[in-house]
Every structure is written in C-alpha cells, then in structure tokens.
Amino acid sequence: MPSIQLPVLLLCLTLSGVCLNGRQFPPELSENMGRSSLDDILQRSGSHMLQSVLKKVEKKEEMNKELNMPLPQWLSKRQHPGKRYISDPEKRQHPGKRDVEEKASFGDIQKRQHLGKTEVEGYLVNYLELKKRQHPGRRSLWDQSTDISSSQLTYLNELSKRQHPGRRYLMYKHQHPSKRGWNDELDLSDQNWEKHQQFGNRDRDSDSPDYTGPCDLQQSAICNKDSLLLDLAEKFSKEGVEEKHQHPGRRSAWENETEE
C-alpha cells in the first residue's frame, strides 16, 4: 500500500503546480499578485512535507525487511563488530566457564586441578611427590625404609666391607635417630654384644639344643683333647690381654672374685 500511495501523491502535486503556473489572472485581480510569494511558501512547505513522508515510508520498509530477516543475521548487523558471533557463544564465554564435557579433555582438567584434588588414578604419583617434599623427621618409618633403594644398600654393604672393622656402620651412628630403622638398631646392638663377649664364647648359643659346651666330661671318649687345649690357651691369652687393658683399680675386684 505505501508504494502505491507515493506515486499518486506525486502526480497530484505536480498537476496542482502546473495549473497554478499556467493560470492567467484577470486585470482586476492584479493587486493580488503580491500573494504569489505566499503560494511559493506553500509549495515549499508541501515539498518538505512530501520529503518527510517519503523518508518515513522508507524507514518503515526497512523495518519490515529487517523483521522478515532471520534473527541472528539481524542482530549481527546491528551489533558492534566486537560483540558479534552470537551463533558461537563459546567464543564470548570466559575460558574457565566453557562446556567442560565437549571442549576440555580429562588431561586438561588434571593439569588445571590442584594436587590435592586430582583423581584417584594419579594419587600414588602425587603421594610420592608430597612425600619427597615433607621434612624427613615427619615421615613414617615405612616411608623411611622405602626411601633407601637397593643400589644404596649395596653401596653401604661394599663400603662396610672396605672400611676398618672398628669404623663400620659409622654412617648409621651419625644419622638422626628418627632416620634409623629398628633393624639397624638391632644389628648394632648385636655387634656391640659380640664385642663385649669373650673371644671363646662368641658365635655360641648356650640356649640352643646343639650346643654341648667346650667338652662334655661324661663323654670323654668323644671329646677332642686337642681342641680343648687350644680353646683353653686362647682363653688364657685373651684374659691376659684384657687384664692389661683394664684399669688397675678394676683388676683387684676381678682377682678377689677369682680367689673366692
């Protein structure tokens, strides 16, 4: 309808202008020629009105076309260039708020998570890393025993063989008590007990059923006299050496006990 009304209005205005321009006024109406200026003003006002009407019609047609267009295309034309891409909302979202199930993989989620919040599958690796970061005194005995690898144990064994017998296990003695294992302490106590024992009595367990003593007097035929003499000689020689190493004040007490 607006497209039909527009040419009709134009024809009417042109015809009225031609009639006014070609019209011949009678001589008695010559005094009214001063009113021609008023007619010019009216024509100009009419032309302005027509222009305004045409502009309004054009705007209405544009609005109708935009309404008939699809919604995303219409919005993309009206939006700012930096705010377009409404068809792809993930580009406008924050990286941390995107759909995790479609765009982010499980590995990326583990990388972004905190160490204490990772899944159970990677718990062992994280536990080992945390154990390394802890203070040695706060670790458990099991963790301390697992820290010593097989290569370190072989190195300690070779080192103990190459060292002087009196200087073995020096590394264990200088360690902190919390870092020593209970097996090491038992080995050290056994070694110290062997040092304090008499030379002839070492490596003999009197409680064992196989132990029969140096010689059984009731079984004189089975007893080896040579071995008995050697044991007695070693015993007396060892006692003499220990007597020399003892303090003079301690010898008298031992001699009194022997005399009694």
From Swiss-Prot:
In-chain residues carrying the UniProt-annotated modification Leucine amide: L115
GO biological process terms on file: eating behavior; histamine metabolic process; hormone-mediated signaling pathway; negative regulation of glutamate secretion; positive regulation of gamma-aminobutyric acid secretion; positive regulation of insulin secretion
Keywords linked to the UniProt accession: Amidation, Cleavage on pair of basic residues, Hormone, Pyrrolidone carboxylic acid, Repeat, Secreted, Signal
Leader sequence residues: 1-24
InterPro entries for this protein: TRH (IPR008857)
A GO MF label: thyrotropin-releasing hormone activity
Recorded GO CC terms: extracellular region; secretory granule
Positions of modified residues (Pyrrolidone carboxylic acid): Q79, Q93, Q113, Q134, Q163, Q246
Keyword Membrane found: no
Location(s), subcellular: Secreted
Ranges where the record places region Disordered: 72-112, 195-217, 238-260
List of residues that carry Proline amide: P81, P95, P136, P165, P248
Keyword Secreted belongs to the record: yes
Biased composition regions of type Basic and acidic residues, renumbered to the chain: 85-112, 195-207
The organism's place on the tree of life at top rank: Eukaryota
Described function: Functions as a regulator of the biosynthesis of TSH in the anterior pituitary gland and as a neurotransmitter/ neuromodulator in the central and peripheral nervous systems.
Family label: Belongs to the TRH family.
Name the record gives this protein: Pro-thyrotropin-releasing hormone
Protein source organism: Gallus gallus
